[in-house]
Design a protein with these regions (language model features):
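Gram-negative bacterial Sec-dependent N-terminal signal peptides
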Residues: 2-21
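Extracytoplasmic metal-acquisition and chelation regions
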Residues: 20-211
Length: 211
């Protein structure tokens, strides 16, 4: 069974003692998650984005290059099956040896009830081409996620768009740093420092918006 289906706490337990000789290959499902992972990895490496910009995460067919990135990954960070149920099977098939983390299951994540008529479907991989300074905006700006298939939502009893909460984005930065540090202890200091800087950037953005 792929580790992607395990709760985050158990995945972390299984990960104990596992370290890679080089900087791990990392895959992220959508733009906002990519942006958070890229912020944590800044100066060390860069993740691969699984789904192209503007695609709906609810139904998607991987391009060959995206499937290869998933297959090559040592770690996979994705929102979870609530958002992309199809991706569970792809990870099971292509990345069965990867350590996959469903961020929506992370301790401290605030999950809301489904929101009717919400417009969330454009997932922009902020910073993919030029740095990653826009990741804080991914965490709170609903306008960056315009609808493409608003009438096709078939979510369960909770809203899978958890990255829109700045608090969740900050929680996930910590989770990402922890998982990367366990896989790559030599760069743990950089991962945690980057996560702290990312949290500070989000806090500053929220304060500016609320001012």
């Amino acid at each position: 069974m792929s580790r992607t289906l395990l709760p985050l706490s158990l995945t972390a337990t299984l990960m104990g003692g596992v370290a890679f000789a080089d900087v791990p290959r990392v895959a992220a499902d959508i733009g906002p998650v990519y942006s958070l992972v890229a912020r944590v990895m800044e100066g060390v490496g860069a993740p691969d984005l699984i789904m192209q910009q503007g695609a709906s995460p609810h139904e998607y067919s991987l391009r060959p290059s995206e499937a290869q990135a998933l297959q090559d990954a040592d770690l996979v960070f994705w929102v979870g099956a609530d958002l992309s149920p199809w991706l569970a099977g792809e990870i099971e098939t292509l990345a069965s040896d990867a350590l996959a983390t469903q961020l929506i299951e992370a301790v401290g994540t605030i999950v809301l009830e489904p929101r009717e008529g919400a417009l969330f479907e454009k997932h922009d991989p902020a910073g993919q081409d030029e740095g990653h300074d826009d990741h804080a905006e991914d965490a709170h700006d609903h306008d960056d996620h315009a609808a493409e298939d608003n009438d096709e939502h078939a979510h369960g009893k909770r809203d899978p768009h958890a990255w829109l909460s700045p608090n969740n984005a900050m929680t996930w930065l910590n989770v990402i740093a922890g998982q990367l540090s366990a896989a790559d202890p030599d760069n743990a200091g950089a991962y945690f420092a980057n996560a702290a800087a990312g949290r500070a950037e989000i806090e500053a953005t929220v304060a500016e918006v609320n001012a």
